[in-house]
C-alpha cells in the first residue's frame, strides 16, 4: 500500500520561479525512500509541500489515503519532520525535551514517559542522560531531535539531509537509527540526501530528481542496472495505460521492467531480441 503518491505536481512561486515541474513519485508504506538530487533540484520545495508548509500550484498528492491539500490538518498529527537545523532546546534536559514534545501533542503523561524510555534505550541515548544537552555533539543532537519527533508515534517521518556535516562514525550510527525506525517501529521514512552511498545503503526505493522533476525511481539494484545495462523507454498516453502495458510485458519477458508514471523502462543487454519475443 502506498504511503505517499505524488502525481504531476507543479510549484511556481509568485516571482515566476518554477521549483517543481510536474514531478511524480510513489512511496510505499514501511520503506525508506530516498530523494536524491543536487542543490536547486527541488527537494526542499517538495519536502515543504509534503509536510504541509506549502501548497502546490497544481497536481495531486495522496498521503495515507487522504488528499494532502484537503486533509492537511488531520494529516499533521500523523507525520513528523526533522529539519537540518535541530529543534531541541539546549536549556532543557534530554527528558524535558522529549516530554515537551509530548505535551505539545497532548499525549497522556504516563504514555509519554513510557514512550520516552523506549526511545532512549532503542536509540542509544541512555549514556547521555546525565549530561547537559548543550554539551552534546552535533550527531547526538540530531539523534535526540529524531527521538523527540518519534514521541508522537508518526506514521511517516521526513528527514531533511540528516547526516550532512557528520563524521563517518556519527553517520553510521544515524543509519542504524533509521533502519531501526523502519524495521522495529514500522515507520515510513522519506529522506532527502546528497549522498549516493547513503541512498544506496539505506533505501528500499531511490528517486533521483533534477530541475524539479523525477529522472528515475526504483530500487538501488534497479538504478545500478540502469547505469550498466542498455534500456528501452516506452511512453504511454497515461499512467493507467502504462500499468496495463507493464503487466502484459512482464508476462512475455523475463527482463527487469520499471514503471515510472506514464513510462516503462525495460533493462536488457539485447533489446532487439526481447522486442521480437514480445
Q: What do the PLM-derived regions correspond to, one by one?
A:
Residues 99, 103, 110-128:
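Conserved ABC ATPase "signature" region
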Residues 176-269:
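ABC transporter nucleotide-binding domain
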Amino acid at each position: 500500500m502506498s504511503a505517499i503518491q505524488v502525481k504531476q505536481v507543479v510549484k511556481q512561486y509568485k516571482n515566476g520561479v518554477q521549483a517543481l515541474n510536474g514531478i511524480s513519485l510513489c512511496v510505499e508504506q514501511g520503506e525508506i525512500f530516498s530523494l536524491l538530487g543536487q542543490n536547486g533540484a527541488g527537494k526542499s520545495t517538495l519536502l515543504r509541500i509534503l509536510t504541509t508548509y506549502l501548497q502546490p500550484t497544481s497536481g495531486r498528492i495522496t498521503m495515507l489515503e487522504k488528499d494532502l491539500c484537503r486533509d492537511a490538518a488531520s494529516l499533521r498529527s500523523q507525520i513528523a519532520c526533522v529539519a537540518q537545523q535541530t529543534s531541541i532546546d539546549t536549556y532543557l534536559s534530554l527528558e524535558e525535551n522529549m516530554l515537551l514534545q509530548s505535551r505539545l501533542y497532548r499525549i497522556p503523561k504516563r504514555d509519554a514517559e513510557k514512550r520516552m524510555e523506549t526511545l532512549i534505550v532503542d536509540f542509544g541515548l541512555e549514556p547521555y542522560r546525565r549530561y547537559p544537552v548543550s554539551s552534546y555533539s552535533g550527531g547526538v543532537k540530531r539523534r535526540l531531535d529524531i527521538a523527540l519527533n518519534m514521541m508522537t508515534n508518526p506514521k511517516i517521518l521526513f528527514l531533511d539531509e540528516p547526516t550532512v556535516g557528520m563524521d563517518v562514525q556519527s553517520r553510521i550510527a544515524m543509519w542504524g537509527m533509521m533502519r531501526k525506525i523502519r524495521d522495529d517501529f514500522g515507520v515510513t521514512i522519506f529522506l532527502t540526501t546528497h549522498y549516493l552511498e547513503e541512498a544506496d545503503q539505506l533505501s528500499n526505493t531511490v528517486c533521483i530528481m533534477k530541475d524539479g522533476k523525477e529522472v528515475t525511481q526504483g530500487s538501488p539494484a534497479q538504478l545500478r542496472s540502469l547505469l550498466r545495462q542498455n534500456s528501452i523507454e516506452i511512453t504511454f498516453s497515461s499512467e493507467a495505460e502504462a500499468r496495463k502495458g507493464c503487466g502484459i510485458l512482464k508476462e512475455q519477458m523475463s527482463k527487469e521492467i520499471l514503471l515510472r508514471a506514464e513510462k516503462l523502462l525495460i533493462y536488457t543487454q539485447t533489446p532487439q531480441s526481447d522486442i521480437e519475443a514480445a
